[in-house]
Amino acid sequence: MIQRGHFNVKSLNDDMSEQIFHTYLESIDGQKRYFLQSDYREFAKYMYRIDDQLIELDLTFFDLTYKRLILRMNEVESLYASLLSRPFDFEKKESFDMDYEEQLFPLSQTSRAEKWRKQLKLSTLSVLYDKVQETEKKEEESTADYVSPSWVVLEEEARTTTRENMEDYFDLMNDLERKDWFDTVSYTHLTLPTILLV
């Protein structure tokens, strides 16, 4: 059941609709890790209609984005284990742009997979760096019978840690219900109408 909250209908206009659109997408996929450009183009058709939908208590835009987000998250969830199943090439120089605000959504599933590969490589490298530092410290402090783990072992442990972190992340995401995602609309920094799912 949907209940209409108290809000000033005059404040809902195309400008507010555009703000809600951008803020909502930022809150559910701000790092542009799930949606594709084709999704964004489809969502953009609603950019100036959200105000009307809120007034009419029409959840078409929310339903579309919610279902697509779940689909895209499932696609990525099935991808990360494969990307972490083999060692990364840390000799290859690559860059990873973390200025998500300026980025576009990935053009295709292939470009999204490449983005995830780089993100997972960066995460694994960070864990690996910590493991190497820890090993070097143990070498300095230990007795002669301490045997340092090899690079291969440390790299595999780092990938395992990254995989476990991803498993925890997706477990958390999978525990969220539809209403939790719907609440994302209401918790933006904007003054939105109160629309409750009961």
Q: What is each residue range found by the language model?
A:
Residues 1-6, 162-172:
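Short amphipathic alpha-helical segments and their helix-coil junctions
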Residues 139-152, 156:
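Long, low-complexity, polar/charged, intrinsically disordered or flexibly structured peripheral segments
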Residues 188-194:
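Conserved small/polar residues in nucleotide/adenosyl-binding loops
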Residues 1-143:
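Cationic-aromatic interfacial patches
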Residues 7-12, 150, 154, 173-177:
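Short acidic, glycine/proline-enriched loop segments that cap or flank alpha-helices
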Residues 16-17, 21-24, 65, 69-72, ...:
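Stable alpha-helical elements in mature extracytoplasmic
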